[in-house]
């Protein structure tokens, strides 16, 4: 297995996307090791001292005022992990579990959490040998960190709970043993350091972000195809228009669409003598809408890159100041806001895509395309209900885009009285991205058919390659057939990057985190 060396505080989203997509093993840079050891020494000293230090020699949450004897330190940390294993729901998918573990490594690697090097080593070894905890997906309110799901991660390190090794679920004790690893016995504060933090919410949000960027790239491709299918004008994509406004995403979106459509015979065929003065907004305003969505994704990416490198534990060991201080870095409000931004972008990319689908199937608006893109309308319904399905998915995503960060509820006997709801705010992005892939897949079906109806005129070379990639597994719709497999396959081609992969990569390189 390939290994990636990460520097806490300097890790990029590109590196984290590699981890998520490729399942790489991860090791912290050697430069992080001295700080980790030094903070652990400070915690060990505090555990043997008389002064109360939260989570080191006290209880937790509302029980923080109860002093714990030094002899009970290990029991305190083990009890914390086991009692907090209260997650419910479907297990988190393995690639996101791996990302959670890597984010926890990065947080602990900042040298402010007080865990011993052997705790770091076990997480690294579990990643390298493919031991992944089974983590239920529900149960976090996003403050004090993602306690319940991270407890399930930590439990696997103790040999408790369940884990997956070599594709098979088993007890964590068995998984560790089969990988040649031993459970860790936690020292002072280590249990708290493992479960306190925003790593689950952040991993959910990052997975959603990576998929949303992939969808944004696909949307620029499908929208370019749609523009040619309805013989739309490229004049609204002129660079001068967008530089006058100045938004980076808008400028990039317009430039990308122009490049994708460059050389289209269809476009050249109606530069003169076209009675239409302006195209509908779903064509003309693509850069303004999709570009604004890309800007939102970039903003969310910046927040999540900072959070991925953050120490989000409590209390934190301030080695330079020789202090151990309670704070609130575990509160995932920045992640909740980022998740809401991503959700809005996903919903809007899908909304304008659906309007282009509706445009193409409507003979009153499609500039001479046949009704519902079938060569024999009446006897055949063509893509009539595919458009209806896209409308259903669009509306569902609008509902799912309702902000989660505006919600809060007090927990833990009102000690933790304001929470972020970041975890489920970020978890919904998986469902939203799946819906968006379906919408864009339907647009690809419609736009490809529309362009094919313009023969013998051809679209641009890049867009011809996209249609060819689609037609390898989804034949043209000559007459009605059982369509569900076509929709599933077109969504897969979007989701797995096959359609975008047919295009020279430099044309879409700007649309990344």
Curated annotation (Swiss-Prot):
Alphabetic keyword roster: Cytoplasm, Histidine metabolism, Lyase
GO cellular component: cytoplasm
Primary subcellular site in the record, as a coarse category: cytoplasm
Positions bearing the 5-imidazolinone (Ala-Gly) cross-link: 143-145
PROSITE patterns the UniProt entry points to: PAL_HISTIDASE
Biological processes annotated in GO: L-histidine catabolic process to glutamate and formamide; L-histidine catabolic process to glutamate and formate
Location(s) in or outside the cell: Cytoplasm
Modification note: Contains an active site 4-methylidene-imidazol-5-one (MIO), which is formed autocatalytically by cyclization and dehydration of residues Ala-Ser-Gly.
Metabolic or biological pathway: Amino-acid degradation; L-histidine degradation into L-glutamate; N-formimidoyl-L-glutamate from L-histidine: step 1/3
Domain of life assignment: Bacteria
Catalytic activity: L-histidine = trans-urocanate + NH4(+)
SUPFAM superfamilies, A to Z: L-aspartase-like
Residues recorded with modification 2,3-didehydroalanine (Ser): 144
EC number: 4.3.1.3
Gene Ontology molecular function: histidine ammonia-lyase activity
InterPro entries found in the cross-reference section: Aromatic_Lyase (IPR001106), Fumarase/histidase_N (IPR024083), HutH (IPR005921), L-Aspartase-like (IPR008948), Phe/His_NH3-lyase_AS (IPR022313)
Top-level EC class: lyase
Similarity-based family: Belongs to the PAL/histidase family.
PANTHER family: HISTIDINE AMMONIA-LYASE
HAMAP family, sorted: His_ammonia_lyase
Protein name listed in UniProt: Histidine ammonia-lyase
Taxonomic path: Bacteria, Pseudomonadati, Pseudomonadota, Alphaproteobacteria, Rhodobacterales
Gene label: hutH
